[in-house]
């Protein structure tokens, strides 16, 4: 699901669904029927500091919640939601408070398994200068692991692999009896990284 055509998704194994974001839940519903796992990576990206808080909340909370709601109605048991390091609905900073609210909204939907993925600086995308990708790892030793930079492909690998593991456990009757929420920061995502292959799709 995307708001515009993405050339990188041109693959016979991928079905791209372009939707009107303001009618997201309605337009996504037919495509969500029968899904097992939903992965959401909504984010404001570059320029968020210049945006009104109302617009930021629409992108960070309203749209992801609508997406997740459609997936839940369609039958999804597992939701992987990208949030951010430091997310806290009680934070004094608008951004982290908004991301914390996103997490709360996701929890309220009560998926059988909810994975909240909290990356810090995401490398390999147009919003992060390439120089940052070189400099950030040099300082990893001096900062808590939760704030380590992560390549977008490693983040995607972690979201997919952990979600598949969670769904398999549920399908085999080994999952939790009640809805489970797991927060995954850098250390929890690291086992799914591919060393020396961060630029591979």
Predicted regions and their residues:
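Conserved Rossmann-fold NAD(P)-dependent oxidoreductase catalytic core, especially the SDR/UDP-sugar
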Residues: 44, 50-103, 108-109, 114-117
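Hydrophobic/aromatic beta-strand patches that form the interior of the parallel beta-sheet core
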Residues: 1, 17, 39, 80, ...
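NAD(P)H-binding glycine-rich loop region in Rossmannoid oxidoreductase-like domains
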Residues: 8-66, 70-73
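Short secondary-structure capping/turn segments at boundaries of alpha-helices and beta-strands
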Residues: 2-3, 27
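Oxidoreductase cofactor-interface core, primarily capturing Rossmann-like NAD(P)-dependent enzymes
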Residues: 4-5, 11-12, 35, 88-200
